[in-house]
Amino acid sequence: MDLLRNIPDELICHILSFLTTKEAALTSVLSKRWRNLLAFVSNLHIDDSIFLHPEEGKRDRNEIRQSFLDFVGRILALQGNCPVKKVSIKFLFKLDSDRVDGWISNVLARGVSELDLSIDLCMDEYFLLSSKRFESKNLVRLKLHRLCIGQREKTVGWLAGEIFLPMLKTLELDYVGFYGDLLFLRALPALEELVIVDAFWFTTFTDVTVSNPSLKTLTMSSNIYSGSISFDTPSLVYFSHFKYVAKDYPLVNMENLLEARINLGVTEGQIRRAREPNNNDEVVLRFPNVGKLMNGIRNVQCLDLSANTLEMLSLSCESMPVFKNLKSLSIKSAENRGWQAMPVLLRNCPHLETLVLEGLLHFVTDKCGDACDCVSREEKGRSLTSCPVKTLEIKEFHGTMEEMYMITHFLDYFPCLKELKIYIEGNDHAQREVSEVIAEKIKLYNKSSSSNVQLMVSGYHE
């Protein structure tokens, strides 16, 4: 106990800030001094699972729930007007909005800079978050999980600018439902990072707009169909888009984009119908609009495309933009997805330096193009001969004969190739055998060519 008495108050508060609020409160048994210091802890972590012990069934007992709510109220009352930095509130049972509004209002008034709010109800229920309390000149990071934004009757509140967070830099929306479109970003003039994961709109095929002049990083991931999506984000430098194909992309303003990762979600049935000639399927007809998305990111320097995305681009080859700034291109392959768009894509990257292929095996069609060696044609390798790529990385390599033929194809037709990196799948023995075969192939190639390709072979790693 003598050691505890000698610990400075500031250090004790710092230690308590790493504990959940319940655990920090339990330290009051050590001394009355520690209980008083709880009022000055700058981080609050309120989690009902720690208090209610759901594995023991306590969450289902009303008196236990009420006891926890009373505990939260006492903690906030004890702290009074003391400044607070980080607050995390996580609940798995129903709360009345007035109580939550009161908690949020309390911590915002005390200058909270990071707020994480999660009220995870049952599968078909969502907590409707009010906007009337959301005004703060100190909040820098806000994360919302499994909440509803807007109002059922009309799209006001969050969506009509009733909030104002002038210092907010990071906004994370995880499994959040919207009534209306995403327009409240205008109330966030300093926003730099926006993450939207599994968001959905209660109104069918809503036209969504993401508009913010200061936004630098945008991540969107959703398995829900939507209407059109517009992006008016002129300062964006990083864009990650994992989503079903939108109905349209009317506006894509990303003039300063440096890096993009595009993974479009499609079903097997949609892929099959898209490959059919003159298909008038409503969903398939929207796929060529992906060309508008690609045109909007044409200034990108690093681009990562999924196998689905590459196949979808085959429906908009005629509108494929020239990626004049692109230095690094990474493409994921799949045996059930085609490379039809690969030739025009490579031809439209006049300054490409690094090409990363995550797998070589793909779905072969008569429109597979001249980028691979799958189909015999007179103009073999034409798209490769115009590509200035210097470094070729091949991942998920298994050493099959088909893959070996493709390695030879790349060596024959990439005129500027200087370095070949191959990451081999399989056990050590298989990797060693494949490495020896490839090394011999490179040796023979360098003897018969003016080039001097350097080979790097290793086991596959992320």
Swiss-Prot record:
Intervals holding LRR repeats: 118-146, 148-175, 197-222, 302-333, 334-359
One Pfam family in the UniProt entry: F-box
Gene3D superfamilies noted in UniProt: 1.20.1280.50, Ribonuclease Inhibitor
Read off the InterPro entries from this record: F-box-like_dom_sf, F-box_AtFBL13-like, F-box_dom, FBD, FBL60-like, LRR_dom_sf
KW Repeat (keyword) present:
yes
Q: Where is the F-box domain?
A: 1-47
Point out the coiled-coil segments of this chain: none
Q: Which UniProt keywords apply?
A: Leucine-rich repeat, Repeat
What name does the UniProt record give this protein? F-box/LRR-repeat protein At5g38396
Q: Which species is the source of this protein?
A: Arabidopsis thaliana (Mouse-ear cress)
